């Protein structure tokens, strides 16, 4: 993907962000060498420096933006879009007491929006602003790279307004989001989860490629669009102030694009200057400040919709008073707690936010108030953190947490299995040769290792064949082109019960063991080596053989 960063248009109002969507007829000049007529932008970086002119204390009359005023809701709504906004503020009664908070703890429940998340607000606002500017016209196509919730909001609005909608989202995102998007009539394109945001394979890169190929298409670009924070400045923040009678001492919000926390915080800084703004960023993301908070070996996380590997343009980190990092285990634990103890059917990022809130609000006293933003609903995660099996497989629940009667073999170790010597291939072996080896040896998959035996990834017969049939690779290409790293590992000391949970959702697990290697410098390092590959057939054969011997 080209690294050039075209400058966003700045209209006569001096709008600091891109004032509308990126259309296929945009005015950003970027074409082929020597082609002076070409004005087609290849892409615009979602982390371009912001040129926003907002300043605390600056009169609202000097704002270059169109601002909306909340309308009184009629008894009969003209369409579902009128059910976006005006979400309830609900008191948290048990969790605050459980963690010894003295202050009042309130939840702004954004999953009561029509599409089920806080992103409904920005989706509607971006489309309305684009329509008002004359950029988005009937019959046009909306394309958006998203983790899912913005896509649902856009697809919902597009269904009502009559636009074609294409959503580009990473493979990590839940199947429930995909199902909802399809039901709303959206077209869906999936991208690799581990692709960097600036690579052609990322959800951002693929969205821009589609935009450049499809006539009359537009990327509304939640990462750069001023309508994102403006939606929260004009509506969400005003609702919070009204619901709290202007009295709140702390606001806690998880951060993705940054539009929610930026818009709300700017309004609160103006109207309630004593309120502390707390930002929540998952471990593996780089949004938090100071930079030391982001230092970790972790690069992936399960919680969806928050955190990024770049700083979105719309995120104003200067309005955040303090950052906290959150992890997956506490996120899903607190999300389940909110459901079980408060009856709030919220998603995983709400758990991240609440987990941080009970830490940050320890400094507040009686008579003070903390507001927590709960971004989306549990609807999107029915097969994820709401599932005990999924939680067990991911290691967020322990076997003893579930009081079920286990079979006799449950607590035996993986080392009890009679695993054959592993078949491994080097990344330089051709796809054609690898397929021949797997067929000859009767295997469906094999670990890919380097010359030293260090695990690089896995390759499966099915994945190679589908890649060849789709023309993604040639038979002579190295197998390193089709390896993937999203597979489950298990150790010899793990239980067969844990293996069973993995095999309920995956076709195989890679059995590994640690090796300590000493270097000439006197230092040592630990690396994982392949011990074998185990499948459901291996487990079933072991159980059947043991029961046969006992008879």
Curated annotation (Swiss-Prot):
Signal peptide: none annotated. Residues 418-476 form the CBS domain. Pathway: Amino-acid biosynthesis; L-cysteine biosynthesis; L-cysteine from L-homocysteine and L-serine: step 1/2. The modification Phosphoserine is found at residues 27, 199. Gene3D superfamilies: 3.40.50.1100, CBS-domain (3.10.580.10). Keywords: Amino-acid biosynthesis, CBS domain, Cysteine biosynthesis, Cytoplasm, Heme, Iron, Isopeptide bond, Lyase, Metal-binding, Nucleus, Phosphoprotein, Pyridoxal phosphate, Ubl conjugation. Allosterically activated by S-adenosyl-methionine/AdoMet. Activated by S-adenosylhomocysteine/AdoHcy. Binds non-covalently to a heme group that may control the redox sensitivity of the enzyme. Pfam families: CBS, PALP. It is found in: Cytoplasm; Nucleus. Heme binds at residues 52, 65. Its EC number is 4.2.1.22. It is an enzyme of class 4 (lyase). SMART domains: CBS. GO terms for cellular component: cytoplasm; nucleus. Residues 1-73 are annotated as: Disordered. GO terms for biological process: cysteine biosynthetic process from serine; cysteine biosynthetic process via cystathionine; homocysteine catabolic process; homocysteine metabolic process; hydrogen sulfide biosynthetic process; L-serine metabolic process. The lineage of its organism: Eukaryota, Metazoa, Chordata, Craniata, Vertebrata. It comes from Macaca fascicularis. It catalyses: L-homocysteine + L-serine = L,L-cystathionine + H2O. Homotetramer. There is a cross-link at residue 211 (Glycyl lysine isopeptide (Lys-Gly) (interchain with G-Cter in SUMO)). This is Cystathionine beta-synthase.
């Amino acid at each position: 993907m080209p690294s050039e960063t075209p400058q966003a248009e700045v209209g006569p109002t001096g709008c600091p962000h891109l004032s509308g969507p990126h259309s296929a007829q945009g005015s950003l000049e970027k074409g082929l060498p020597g082609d002076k007529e070409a004005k087609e932008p290849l892409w615009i970086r979602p982390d371009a420096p912001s040129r926003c002119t907002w300043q605390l204390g600056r009169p609202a009359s000097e704002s270059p933006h169109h601002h909306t005023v909340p309308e009184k809701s009629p008894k009969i709504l003209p369409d579902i879009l009128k059910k976006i906004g005006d979400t309830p503020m609900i008191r948290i009664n048990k969790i605050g007491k459980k963690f010894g908070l003295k202050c009042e703890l309130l939840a702004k429940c954004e999953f009561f929006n029509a599409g089920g998340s806080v992103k409904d607000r920005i989706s509607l606002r971006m489309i309305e602003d684009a329509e008002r500017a004359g950029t988005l016209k009937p019959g046009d196509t909306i394309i958006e790279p998203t983790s899912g919730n913005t896509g649902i909001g856009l697809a919902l609005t597009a269904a009502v307004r009559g636009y074609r909608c294409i959503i580009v989202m990473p493979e990590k995102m839940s199947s429930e989001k995909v199902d909802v998007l399809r039901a709303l009539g959206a077209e869906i394109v999936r991208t690799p989860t581990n692709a960097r945001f600036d690579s052609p394979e990322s959800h951002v890169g693929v969205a821009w490629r589609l935009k450049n190929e499809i006539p009359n298409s537009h990327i509304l670009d939640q990462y750069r669009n001023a309508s994102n924070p403006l939606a929260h400045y004009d509506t969400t923040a005003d609702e919070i102030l009204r619901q709290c009678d202007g009295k709140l001492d702390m606001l806690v919000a998880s951060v993705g694009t940054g539009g929610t926390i930026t818009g709300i915080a700017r309004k609160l800084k103006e109207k309630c200057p004593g309120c502390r703004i707390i930002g929540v960023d998952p471990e593996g993301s780089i949004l938090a400040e100071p930079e030391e908070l982001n230092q970790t070996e972790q690069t992936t996380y399960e919680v969806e919709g928050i955190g990024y590997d770049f700083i979105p343009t719309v995120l104003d980190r200067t309005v955040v008073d303090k950052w906290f990092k959150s992890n997956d285990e506490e996120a899903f634990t607190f999300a389940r707690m909110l459901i079980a103890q408060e009856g709030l059917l919220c998603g995983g990022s709400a758990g991240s936010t609440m987990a941080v809130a009970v830490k940050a609000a320890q400094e507040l006293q009686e008579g003070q108030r903390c507001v927590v933003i709960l971004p989306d609903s549990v609807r999107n995660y029915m097969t994820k953190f709401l599932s005990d099996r999924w939680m067990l497989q991911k290691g967020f629940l322990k076997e003893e947490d579930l009081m079920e009667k286990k079979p006799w073999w449950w607590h035996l170790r993986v080392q009890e299995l009679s695993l054959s010597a592993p078949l491994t291939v080097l990344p330089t072996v051709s796809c054609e040769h690898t397929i021949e080896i797997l067929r000859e040896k009767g295997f469906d998959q094999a670990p890919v290792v380097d010359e030293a035996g260090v695990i690089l990834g896995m390759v499966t017969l099915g994945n190679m064949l589908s890649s060849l049939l789709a023309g993604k690779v040639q038979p002579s290409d190295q197998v390193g082109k089709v390896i993937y790293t999203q597979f489950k590992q298990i150790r010899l000391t793990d239980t067969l019960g844990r293996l069973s949970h993995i095999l309920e959702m995956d076709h195989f697990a890679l059995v590994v063991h640690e090796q300590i290697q000493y270097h000439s410098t006197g230092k040592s390092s630990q690396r994982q080596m392949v011990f074998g590959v185990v499948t459901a057939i291996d487990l079933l054969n072991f159980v059947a053989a043991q029961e046969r011997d006992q008879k």
